[in-house]
Amino acid sequence: MEAVIKAVLTGYPGETSKKDSKKKPPATSKKDPEKTPLLPTRVNYILIIGVLVLCEVTGVRADVHLLEQPGNLWITWASRTGQTDFCLSTQSATSPFQTCLIGIPSPISEGDFKGYVSDNCTTLEPHRLVSRGIPGGPENSTTLTYQKVSCLLLKLNVSLLDEPSELQLLGSQSLPNITNITRIPSVAGGCIGFTPYDSPAGVYGWDRREVTHILLTDPGNNPFFDKASNSSKPFTVVTADRHNLFMGSEYCGAYGYRFWEMYNCSQMRQNWSICQDVWGRGPPENWCTSTGGTWVNQSKEFNETEPFSFTVNCTGSNLGNVSGCCGEPITILPPEAWVDSTQGSFTKPKALPPAIFLICGDRAWQGIPSRPVGGPCYLGKLTMLAPNHTDILKILANSSRTGIRRKRSVSHLDDTCSDEVQLWGPTARIFASILAPGVAAAQALKEIERLACWSVKQANLTTSLLGDLLDDVTSIRHAVLQNRAAIDFLLLAHGHGCEDVAGMCCFNLSDHSESIQKKFQLMKEHVNKIGVDSDPIGSWLRGLFGGIGEWAVHLLKGLLLGLVVILLLVVCLPCLLQIVCGNIRKMINNSISYHTEYKKLQKAYGQPESRIV
């Protein structure tokens, strides 16, 4: 039965008869068996019918389990990584997706972890420039970032249902060096490591495959090994794939100043020595000097001048023997930077706050995997290797600009404006131009306003229509790219390369979205060029005097109005005075002439002059 089912699924039975084995394969069958289609060939259709009949007769039912759909892959990508751009790279069939993201260190604050940790990390042991085990050292101390990071990771209390997805990065940025003990960058000294023991895990080295091999093949050195089930509990080696590029002070940052410590080194067996929990070949003094320390016999005094003058007295008697190493710790990371991954908080995968990732060289997780081992790692964020066009525009828009030109106070046309254009005919234009030029000019301005209203409404309808079409084209484009990416992924995962499917490696999809967006924006800006200048005097004053306030504009308008009134009075007052004087003179002349005529009439009729009223 199993052989029949295998033959149905693969097209090759489990065992071949001798008669069939003597047959030569056809000349056209030169493909790799791994690339054989999963569906049966035409010859096996009879076997399919036989299996179906057999299942119906025996009552065997094949239940179909519908898996819950996880949602859109790219929406999940964007929400988890905080990125809207990505690229696909068909580098290998085993990992066809390669992101264009890189890791960058980010300052860590307890406010970012609100709701994700069980307690705060306010009381952290400071890192002294000279340890308390060395008498006479200065009371200078600082808190490096790794102490806060390790404390927060140990207090994570939000568990994940599944292991966090791993992201393959192009790389990650190294941490800055500590060049001034009094001004340490906020992300300096943020590297941590994960060890299944209470001591530093320098014994594992940094090779991911080597660490995995040791933990899987040597149960004695594997703290995750369960003797009852004779198997190891699942663990995750978080060391970078290209570990030689992401290790040591080149990646975690170098301490520009020596952090003096005193620790014991002794020779345990032939050609093997141990210094502070780290084993190595050779005598212990070689270990000490190779890591920047100084071998001490009984006592030695060191005079330091950086970052300030002080004296360090390293005494071997403090170690309980007559010799030791005085200087930097010999591990790549300080002992406090190693997090014990056997603690209860790491038995299950833990969630990190949004947009915060565990970055380990060229690998990243949006969470802490269960039982992590290796390093070095730090908490940071992901970004594109180069900013895209949208990010560049945002940066330029938010940058400080000088000499900003203020726009005129032009208001856009209202939606309720009249767009009914009724032009006059030739006869009306001729008679209006000859008999009433003012009426013709007013009618022309009215029709121009209606034409502007019609143009704005027409342009708004056009841009709205093009915007809807552009949204449809964008959604179709995204669907095509998503389907093509899914098809390529499935083909590569099943070992089918470019030579199997025509046009697979070359997929040309024209992209004029940037040009369309620019033209679409130009259309919107072109519509906004039609407007009504409701305050021409204020606009003229703003353009004349630059960026003045509104109160100054109103003041200048008042002064300008008063000046215009004064000018009008100066121009018109002589005329008014002349007219008034002329009228007065005319009245006087009329009165004198009337009196003269009256006297003549009196003389003519001989009436006495005294009776004149």
From Swiss-Prot:
Annotated stretches, region: Binding to host receptor: 184-233, 268-294
SUPFAM superfamilies listed in its UniProt record: Virus ectodomain
One Gene Ontology cellular component: membrane
Region annotation Disordered: where it falls in the sequence: 14-36
Gene Ontology terms: biological process: fusion of virus membrane with host plasma membrane; symbiont entry into host cell; virion attachment to host cell
Disulfide bond positions: 87-506, 121-151, 191-252, 265-275, 360-377, 417-453, 498-505
CDD domains in the cross-refs: RSV-like_HR1-HR2 (cd09949)
Similarity section: Belongs to the Alpharetroviruses envelope glycoprotein family.
Name used for this protein in its record: Envelope glycoprotein gp95
Organism listed in the record: Rous sarcoma virus subgroup B (strain Schmidt-Ruppin)
Gene designation per UniProt: env
